[in-house]
Amino acid sequence: MLAFKSDFLHIMSERGFIHQISDEKGLDALFSKEVVSAYIGFDPTASSLHAGSLLQIMMLHWLQKTGHRPIALMGGGTGLIGDPSFKDEARPLLTQDDIATNIVSIKKVFANYLTFGEKETDACIINNAEWLCKLNYLEFLRDVGKHFSINRMLSFDSVRLRLEREHSLSFLEFNYMILQAYDFVELYKRYGLRMQMGGSDQWGNIINGIELGHRLGTPQLYAFTSPLLTTSSGAKMGKSLNGAVWLNADMLSPYQFWQYWRNTEDADVTRFLKLYTTLPMDEILKLSALQGTEINEAKKILATEITAMLHGRDLANTAAKTARKTFEEKTFGENLPTIEINASDLKTGAGLLALLVQAGLAKSNSEARRHIQGGGIRVNDQIIEDETCLILEEDINAQGIIKLSFGKKKHVLIKPL
């Protein structure tokens, strides 16, 4: 790989962000001589991004930190269709109101990573519905559609693999690739953007935009993709046994977010410190040298640094403190997830199975029953073997709460009112 002269590409290379770049020398020269505006597209089909998007957000963070302008493109227009890339089935279509509501919610996250304003390197959030929803279809087909070869589009892995598995690809979704390519050209015309970044699964879509720009007379545009990350065990980033690891605090608490990263596999610690934190490389190298049980300290630092960037240093430290009290001091951490129940329910006894489901420690009564049969459920740190167990007033501790646990790392406090 090229020894980059520009700060941005040097950091991207050093920390492991680079999968593929369309023209390394040309892009490095561009970054070295001027402020570059670049963008990443984000899918607004949910009300929050999850941890799988954090790599791209960190790329925008470093872009701005090295003196360039980051743009977060919200797919308000393309989101009405859905990206078919490597999906086996079409997604349910959302309304424009659904998409708009999701975008408002998603925007909150970016303020924790980027500085917004009117300066040359200040970040901006743009919605592609601004131009896509105003397109004249016949004019678009005539002026843009003519530049796309169906034969070539069918050769893209994202499409080919889906067709090989005999999953249909609707004409609606096929248009997504053309619209995304058009986004790149439109963003150059409106904002002077020269580079699009994304995951490696977006390479074909980004190259389409570069080639369309060339045919329509733009200066050279550039593609930059990052690896599609999985954990060492092959799990997708941003997913846990309990579902998506959401970035919005109202969908996943800072403590639960911290705990997700604390549970990082040993083999992933160094890689994640490079990608998801801004710790200096020399400090990361020191942490990566830790062995045995000492690596747990590196995991705590990883979890705290990532949580601090998203939720703030105070909440990150509180999450770390809660974990320490819960796991090391065997006391009740102040920031553990808490649910409230009627105190009167405990007079006759509340069923443990139902409480486990209500607390989110099981998805159903049958799953809660399996947890108990496997010896994984504890009440106030005491293993429960009876699936008909009732939680009573006498189970309330001196702090006025009851602690439910599944395994060693999942705890919920029950607060009777």
Curated annotation (Swiss-Prot):
Q: Which residues bind L-tyrosine?
A: Y39, Y176, Q180
Domain spans labelled S4 RNA-binding: 350-417
Cellular localisation:
Cytoplasm
A GO cellular component annotation in the UniProt record: cytosol
Q: Name one GO biological process term.
A: tyrosyl-tRNA aminoacylation
**What are this entry's molecular-function GO terms?**
ATP binding; RNA binding; tyrosine-tRNA ligase activity
Amino acids binding ATP: K239
Q: What InterPro entries has UniProt attached to this entry? A: aa-tRNA-synth_Ic, Rossmann-like_a/b/a_fold, S4_RNA-bd_sf, SYY-like_C, Tyr-tRNA-ligase, Tyr-tRNA-ligase_bac-type, Tyr-tRNA-ligase_bac_1
Provide the transmembrane region boundaries. Answer: none
Supply the EC number(s): 6.1.1.1
Q: Where is this motif: 'KMSKS' region?
A: 236-240
**Keyword RNA-binding on entry:** yes
Task: Tell me the keywords, alphabetical order.
Answer: Aminoacyl-tRNA synthetase, ATP-binding, Cytoplasm, Ligase, Nucleotide-binding, Protein biosynthesis, RNA-binding
Give the EC class as a word: ligase
PROSITE patterns tied to this protein? S4
Q: Where is this motif: 'HIGH' region?
A: 44-53
Q: Please state the protein's primary subcellular location.
A: cytoplasm
Instruction: Show the catalytic activity.
Output: tRNA(Tyr) + L-tyrosine + ATP = L-tyrosyl-tRNA(Tyr) + AMP + diphosphate + H(+)
Quaternary structure (record):
Homodimer.
Family (UniProt): Belongs to the class-I aminoacyl-tRNA synthetase family. TyrS type 1 subfamily.
- UniProt function note: Catalyzes the attachment of tyrosine to tRNA(Tyr) in a two-step reaction: tyrosine is first activated by ATP to form Tyr-AMP and then transferred to the acceptor end of tRNA(Tyr).
Name-wise, this protein is Tyrosine--tRNA ligase
Gene from which this protein is expressed: tyrS
